[in-house]
Each structure stands twice: as structure tokens, then as C-alpha cells.
Amino acid sequence: METMKDRLRVMLGDERLSRLEDARVLVFGCGGVGSSCIEALARGGVGTLVIVDKDVVAPSNINRQAIAFESTVGKRKVDVMAAMVADINPSCRVFAHDAFVLAENLVELYEACLEEAGGHIDYVVDAIDTVSTKLALAALAQERDFELISSMGGAKKIHPE
């Protein structure tokens, strides 16, 4: 029986596919950037995703978010995203945190996500809207020496000063 990973195996080989299957990625934010990123990671064969967002899908999200449909309006983004990942890549483990990421709770939230992922995270993705939280996450990455992939979007912020 053909699986979604057959094409990945042809493209990457067994060793690289195995590395993806063992990868653990933490994504802060399930909005425009985060939902597309999480979808790509799931389709790419990543084995563990830890996702964090406090928002619900709104009608205004439909024009740009992978999880936003008329049928998902009003639902928690992390729940919709987790269901989407399970539908794309059933072997991907998803840990969903319905939490608002702030500079003030970032360390505690990171520690909880790290523990849930088995004490190791390969990459952290910043798909956060607020500049102060982005800065706090960058500082934490430097302090804890983890790989950070950061989107410089700012959600509705034309003049961030």
C-alpha cells in the first residue's frame, strides 16, 4: 500500500527520512505563518510537533490561514491544527497547548513544551505576532542555545514602534 512517505523516501533516502521522523519541532503560533509552517512540517515527515496558540479561528483568518474555513470558525486553532496534522501525517505526534505566549510566561511555557517533547527539541519556530515576545524568545534561544527559526511578521502592525 502506498503511503505519504513513499515520495519522501525516494527524494531523501531512508537515513534523512528517519532523521525527519525523529525530529521534534516546537511552533509558537498557529496563525498565518504558523499554520502554513506546521502543515509543511507535517507533510515533510516531521515526527513530533508541539504547537502553542491561544486564539480561535475567526472569519477574517480565512483569507490567509491554512486552518481557517467556514467549518472551523470559532474553534481553537491548536485543536484544528492538531486534527489537520493527524489527517495529513497520522504518525506525527502532536502536543497542543492552548496558551497565549507572552514574554512573561515564555520560560515556563517553553519548559512545559520541552518536557512534553521528551526533554529535547530540535527547532523552535517563532510565528508570534508581538515584538516583545519575539525579542524574549530570541533572548531565550541565545541563553539556552537552541535553534530558532523566526518569522518577522507582526500581524496588523504597520508601524511597530
Regions found by a protein language model. Give the residues of each.
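E1/E1-like adenylate-forming module used to activate ubiquitin-like modifiers
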Residues: 123-161
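Glycine-rich phosphate-binding loop and adjoining beta1-alpha1-beta2 segment
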Residues: 46-89
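Conserved acidic residues
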Residues: 98-100
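Conserved N-terminal Rossmann-fold NAD(P)-binding element of oxidoreductases
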Residues: 27-29, 52
